[in-house]
Amino acid sequence: MDTVLKEKINLGISACMYGCKVRYNKKGWNMSELFGRDQTSFIWHPVCPESLSGMGIPRSPIRVIGESGKAVLEGNAKIKNREGKDVTDMLIKGCNASIEALERANVFAFVYMEGSPSCGVYRTTLKNNRMGKPPGVFGAMLLDRDFFLIPANDLQSPVRRWDWKRRLYAFAWAKEVDINSKDDLFQFWHIVKFLCQEIDEKTAREIGKRLAELPKGFDKESAETLRHEVMMILRQPSSLEKIKNRLWKHYMYFKRKTGVELENVMEPTDMRNMNHIADELMLMEKTSFSTEVLFGAAPILYRGR
């Protein structure tokens, strides 16, 4: 199986995180620049549900009155602005317009503005509770549609940014790769299993056990179930400790296989800053690709135009 993406990923993003000054107070920040040269690996699709709702810029800040954005969609909560005006219907229409735009572009991943009553997923600003009860209205729609979700604030950390990028590449690959035989299924799992084990070892081990016990023949439905399980795992972030431990483990394998030493790769317990760790990870990616040795922590790379 080819493990190199050649087509750019269509990546949605909260417009205020793409430098568009569309927040209620006319502010915005370009978080996509944090990807550096990698930002050209994506086709960006900025949307702002609040702007598309017709509320304009600047506008009165809004809040959820009730349980959460999901409850708003179910008709059990309201959206009101600072003056107390009910803008529920307007915001839902803006969210629907945003979803329609993303779906037209075949977008399946989204960089969202955390803390927003519209785009927030795990933290929102609700009445009398700054942390709120997530998700926001648009965030609830993204969750319902199984989007690969990236909190914009995480892009400020070079290691977290690397983690999101490698999992997004693997997610995009897993979503589209053909699995039409038992051999395809085993090869698919071999490519992603090390990354899955790092993120969720228990579930990954269970998947491996099920594969080992498969009966003869190929069952397409079972293969698609496994694909979905893998994609659910890949949505979850890893941790710094796991990343460092797996980096060292993969480096030891690479060193034994090639005889090549990489002086910049340090042991998990060695002290260094986030930029150094990110440099180690990218060095392993580059060297593994050039020597055709699988780097299990980042098995899928983008090498398009």
Q: What label would you give each PLM region?
A:
Residues 18-26:
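Short N-terminal binding/cap micro-motifs at the start of the first secondary-structure element
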Residues 83-103:
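Glycine-rich anion/phosphate-binding loops
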Residues 166-223:
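A conserved mid-domain beta-alpha-beta active-site/ligand-binding segment of alpha/beta enzyme cores
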Residues 58-90:
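Phosphate/nucleotide-donor binding subsite
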Residues 27-45:
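Short catalytic helix/loop segments, enriched in acidic residues and glycine
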Residues 45-61, 152-162:
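Short connector loops at secondary-structure junctions
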Residues 98-166:
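Internal, conserved structured core segments that host functional sites
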Residues 221-305:
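Extended non-globular C-terminal regions
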